[in-house]
């Protein structure tokens, strides 16, 4: 999982 500032909300399962 990549804790990107934009994707964290989407990818943080």
UniProtKB/Swiss-Prot annotation:
<dbReference type="GO" id="GO:0005783">
    <property type="term" value="C:endoplasmic reticulum"/>
</dbReference>
<keyword id="KW-0963">Cytoplasm</keyword>
<keyword id="KW-0964">Secreted</keyword>
<comment type="function">
    <text>May play a role in altering the properties of cell walls during germinative growth.</text>
</comment>
<protein>
    <recommendedName>
        <fullName>Germin GS2</fullName>
    </recommendedName>
</protein>
<keyword id="KW-0052">Apoplast</keyword>
<keyword id="KW-0134">Cell wall</keyword>
<keyword id="KW-0961">Cell wall biogenesis/degradation</keyword>
<dbReference type="GO" id="GO:0048046">
    <property type="term" value="C:apoplast"/>
</dbReference>
<keyword id="KW-0256">Endoplasmic reticulum</keyword>
<dbReference type="GO" id="GO:0071555">
    <property type="term" value="P:cell wall organization"/>
</dbReference>
<dbReference type="GO" id="GO:0005829">
    <property type="term" value="C:cytosol"/>
</dbReference>
<comment type="similarity">
    <text>Belongs to the germin family.</text>
</comment>
<keyword id="KW-0492">Microsome</keyword>
<keyword id="KW-0325">Glycoprotein</keyword>
<comment type="subunit">
    <text>Oligomer (believed to be a pentamer but probably hexamer).</text>
</comment>
